[in-house]
From Swiss-Prot:
Active site (record annotation): 152
Name of the protein described by the UniProt record: Dihydromonapterin reductase
Catalytic activity: (6S)-5,6,7,8-tetrahydrofolate + NADP(+) = 7,8-dihydrofolate + NADPH + H(+); 7,8-dihydromonapterin + NADPH + H(+) = 5,6,7,8-tetrahydromonapterin + NADP(+)
UniProt organism field: Shigella boydii serotype 4 (strain Sb227)
Domain of life: Bacteria
Keyword set, alphabetical order: NADP, One-carbon metabolism, Oxidoreductase
Alphabetized Gene3D superfamilies for the sequence: NAD(P)-binding Rossmann-like Domain (3.40.50.720)
GO biological process entries: one-carbon metabolic process
InterPro entries per UniProt: NAD(P)-bd_dom_sf, Sc_DH/Rdtase_CS, SDR_fam
Any one Gene Ontology molecular-function term assigned to this protein's record: dihydrofolate reductase activity
Primary role: Catalyzes the reduction of dihydromonapterin to tetrahydromonapterin. Also has lower activity with dihydrofolate.
Presence of the UniProt keyword NADP in the record: yes
Length: 240
């Protein structure tokens, strides 16, 4: 008998930056992937050509989240992992209704992973001890808070807390952990002054790039023991 096809890894927000890098990492390992995307960036066409299943999703409403879950349930009988990478960034600023800012941040960072974890739970179970994973991408601000992004920080803190709750609920079949990054890579339009200011916030004074995240994700996926933990990727920023 031939070797069984590996179960797919689901990556939310996989059309750009870290999500896209993770998708290509797994594709290059012959690991099937399912990617959600909100905006059809050119990179999505490359993923589709490489064999990834890419599903456009609107996580701004609970109905949109559940519609995406239904598409995943139709497409596979199981999942190797869910990587909750989809994110949004809103600040409290003049003219923006505060209730709308909070609702938006909670919707993408709390409602979406909460609903998907429940809706797709049966796809993660039944594959053996510690055979499946959920990884939440939180943020360094969970530890420090943020005076300019209060709703964002609060929503990521809620996601961090859900890591421990889902770890309790889904063990020992499913490991649930979170990754809390600070600066990993710059945007193309970031100028030299901003880049230097950002680098100076950490002890290591570098933006390590996607590989740092990929290596940690690989560690969590291959561990048979680690669950309910948050892993900072901040270059010692908490010591500055």
């Amino acid at each position: 008998m031939g070797k069984a096809q590996p179960l797919p890894i689901l990556i939310t927000g996989g059309g750009r930056r870290i999500g896209l890098a993770l998708a290509w990492h797994f594709i290059n390992q012959k690991q099937p992937v399912i990617v959600s995307y909100r905006t059809h960036y050119p990179a999505i066409d490359g993923l589709i050509k490489a064999g990834a299943q890419c599903i456009q999703a609107d996580f701004s409403t609970n109905d949109g989240v559940m519609a995406f879950a239904d598409e995943v349930l139709k497409s596979t009988h199981g999942l190797r992992a869910i990587l909750h990478n989809a994110s949004a960034w809103m600040a409290e600023k003049l003219g923006a209704p505060l209730a709308d800012v909070l609702a938006c941040m909670m919707q993408i960072h709390v409602n979406t992973p909460y609903l998907l974890n429940h809706a797709l739970e049966r796809l993660l179970r039944g594959h053996g001890h510690a055979a499946s994973d959920i990884i939440h991408f939180t943020d360094y601000v969970v530890e420090r808070g943020s005076d300019k992004h209060i709703a964002y920080a609060a929503s990521k803190a809620a996601l961090d807390n859900m890591t421990r709750s889902f770890a309790r609920k889904l063990a020992p079949e499913v490991k649930v952990n979170s990754i809390a990054p600070s600066l990993i890579l710059f945007n193309e339009h970031d100028d030299a002054e901003y880049r230097q200011q950002a680098l100076n916030k950490s002890l290591m004074k570098t933006a390590p790039g996607e590989k740092e995240v990929i290596d940690l994700v690989d560690y969590l996926l291959t561990s048979c023991f680690v669950t309910g933990r948050s892993f900072p990727l901040d270059g010692g920023r908490h010591l500055r």
